[in-house]
């Protein structure tokens, strides 16, 4: 809980703070629960923000999504906001490789800062989900998710699945979208990646595979590219017997291409220093380790 204080990133998130996390699809067993996040969210006095999905489930309309936020306990502890509940706004991506605009919920403009909390794990479409995916697909409205998934072909949710592009274009479109959110909050945005309950499946899956690796730890950074690269390296360097299963998911979907693409866009870097900030490393060997990624 006091990870944010200890992983002092030299930043105090100002004003109205949006905390972007994954509310967890109905039926999913792996998503990070509201109690786990309690200290950090209350410390920044944040509003838990989410956006509607572009596929069927319990989160594709505001009404259903608000009910799920209630059922999963988010609204019991925190202020919550479905950012695309009213309308979309468009952010320009001037140097976008695939898309030149990003459709996000209009409520994004109500916030001065953002704390991005990502549950690091595999993903059936993106290979893995971390900070970059949370910034892109996570913050996009349902039309925006469609636009990214179709690499800019359509914002019509009903036409998403018949317009899927080649995989690398989708991944590059995610990097483009991520850049627009990071740059919007530049200097007032921080990232936490939690390497816990790591399944090959995302928290958006109603039926997800159980975690395949033991928990590794919690990372904090001001750089979304560095923090995702550090997570992938921690998986790759692990001796855990589930490592290959997770890497197969990441590699088969060209997951790491998002790091290369984001690197090219220049809103961060994949070169990092990983600092273990546990005070007593021995005592912590059975618990989550805490790292800062600089």
Could you describe each region identified by the protein language model?
Residues 2-38, 42, 46-294:
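Extended, low-polarity segments enriched in aliphatic/aromatic residues
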